[in-house]
């Protein structure tokens, strides 16, 4: 692998507008070859999407998805910059795909990492710090292990971090960036709600003997 220097990462970022981590990953994937890294970023839809990410996305659409059998339903708000784009096929297709993703991910609760409340993060840290397999380890080693475990756990709660259900080589965030690059506008997943039939309802379940007894008493 080529020597991936901070300057190389910065130069690639300046050329593409992509984030530092995306640039570093692109260079690692292409052995430090800048031209190939550029191509890698474009294929991921990242190169031009990042430059648009700071623009206001106040238009968009609220989509709904009902899974087969009508047992799971999703409402999702996807934002863009113009009403024209919101009505377009690329945007509407993305809205449907991301809504389907939410339906397929029952553990997902937040759009992005920065939406997770600090008390949830702290609670996860306390749980991990108290695990038996960490007892006796030096504090600095314990901190690193816990940091990795927490990052993994928090990513499980975040929609944008999920592997895309139709192509696990992509994350949902990659999918959104690809669409943004194609249409030339900033796109944001703002919020979502997932409904599961019967969720939160306590069912009165009889065993067979109780059911027979209740029939006899009628």
UniProtKB/Swiss-Prot annotation:
Its main location: cytoplasm. One of its GO terms (cellular component) is cytoplasm. Keywords: Cytoplasm, Elongation factor, Protein biosynthesis. It is found in: Cytoplasm. Residues 82-85 are annotated as: Involved in Mg(2+) ion dislocation from EF-Tu. SUPFAM superfamilies: Elongation factor Ts (EF-Ts), dimerisation domain, UBA-like. GO terms for molecular function: translation elongation factor activity. Belongs to the EF-Ts family. Associates with the EF-Tu.GDP complex and induces the exchange of GDP to GTP. It remains bound to the aminoacyl-tRNA.EF-Tu.GTP complex up to the GTP hydrolysis stage on the ribosome. PANTHER family: ELONGATION FACTOR TS (PTHR11741), POLYPROTEIN OF EF-TS, CHLOROPLASTIC (PTHR11741:SF10). This is Elongation factor Ts. It comes from Prochlorococcus marinus subsp. pastoris (strain CCMP1986 / NIES-2087 / MED4). The gene is tsf.
